[in-house]
Curated annotation (Swiss-Prot):
CDD domains: IgV_TCR_beta (cd05899). PROSITE patterns: IG_LIKE (PS50835). This is T-cell receptor beta chain V region LB2. It comes from the Eukaryota. Residues 22-116 are annotated as: V segment. The keyword Transferase does not apply. PANTHER family: T CELL RECEPTOR BETA VARIABLE 19, T-CELL RECEPTOR BETA CHAIN. GO terms for cellular component: plasma membrane; T cell receptor complex. Residues 121-136 are annotated as: J segment. This sequence was derived from a T-helper clone. GO terms for biological process: adaptive immune response; cell surface receptor signaling pathway. Disulfide bonds join C45-C113. The keyword Signal applies. It comes from Mus musculus (Mouse).
Length: 136
């Protein structure tokens, strides 16, 4: 592999912000998370789009996105298809936290935060770069 390509790929992997064409940013922290079985783990998401609705999704290898929680505004939490084993918190319009209440042994997954805006009859979701969780 060319050293410039390697440097570019490395830089992309270390970036925790996803910038979208209209200048908005979704930041997920941490980028990588290693935990132990039974541990409570918290993931954070910030957006500066001024979007009302935010989401947390889980994506396991070989599977599509599964909705964990979403929030239409501050202090409003709606359970998704996969909310068992998770808690969420949204005290400000710009931030949405997700807590894995009890990490499962050998769990390896990616969590994705998104925010959305509805224009006319279409809704566009803007995604963060993801948090990769590994449980030992």
């Amino acid at each position: 592999m060319n050293k410039w390509v390697f440097c570019w790929v490395t830089l992309c992997l270390l970036t925790v912000e996803t910038t979208h064409g209209d200048g908005g940013i979704i930041t997920q922290t941490p980028k990588f998370l290693i935990g132990q079985e039974g541990q409570k783990l918290t993931l954070k998401c910030q957006q500066n789009f001024n979007h009302d609705t935010m989401y947390w999704y889980r994506q396991d290898s070989g599977k599509g996105l599964r909705l964990i929680y979403y929030s239409i505004t501050e202090n409003d939490l709606q359970k998704g298809d996969l909310s068992e084993g998770y808690d969420a918190s949204r005290e400000k319009k710009s931030s949405f936290s997700l807590t894995v209440t009890s990490a499962q042994k050998n769990e390896m997954t990616v969590f994705l935060c998104a925010s959305s805006i509805r224009l006319a009859s279409a809704e566009t979701l803007y995604f963060g770069s993801g948090t990769r969780l590994t449980v030992l």
